[in-house]
């Protein structure tokens, strides 16, 4: 697998909205695997395709805390429900290195997506996993940490 270059702020591609993936072909599968390697090589817990210069709605993440690698790939992720309860996490971003900021987001979310095998799924995320998927979906929508306000971030 190939380690991909991570775009850094203020690269204008980071502010563009990503397009839906319509066909999960070998190129998309390779992108997902390369993104997972890149995320691990940079000690990240999540990575969105726009961060590696690909304007497709693809996210990889692994927020497991048991030392085992448990990557999750989400293609065309969409939040279909979010809790009223909010949590604060200190977030960082591979595209804005060395800066962290406390952000408020819904504590839990339900996300509809397609996996790398083309299977439609819906998963419930809470805690750091919920924060991570919301952060990565922000990237898909052209929003960067620290540069764009979020609805619950007040």
Give short role names for the model-derived ranges.
Residues 1-148:
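Positively charged
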Residues 149-154:
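A short, hydrophobic C-terminal helix/tail in secreted or cell-surface proteins
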């Amino acid at each position: 697998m190939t380690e991909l270059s991570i775009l850094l702020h203020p690269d204008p591609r980071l502010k563009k909205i990503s397009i839906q993936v319509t066909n999960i072909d070998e190129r998309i599968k390779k992108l997902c695997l390369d993104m997972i390697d890149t995320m691990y090589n940079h000690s990240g817990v999540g990575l969105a395709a726009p961060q590696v210069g690909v304007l497709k709605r693809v996210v990889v993440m692994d927020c497991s805390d048991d030392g085992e690698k448990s990557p999750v790939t989400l293609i065309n992720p969409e939040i279909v429900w979010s809790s009223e309860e909010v949590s604060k996490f200190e977030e960082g971003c591979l595209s804005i290195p060395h800066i962290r900021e406390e952000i408020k987001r819904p504590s839990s979310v339900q996300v509809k997506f397609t996996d790398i095998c083309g299977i439609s799924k819906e998963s419930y995320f809470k805690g750091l996993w919920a924060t991570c998927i919301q952060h990565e979906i922000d990237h898909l929508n052209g929003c960067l940490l620290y540069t764009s306000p979020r609805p619950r971030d007040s």
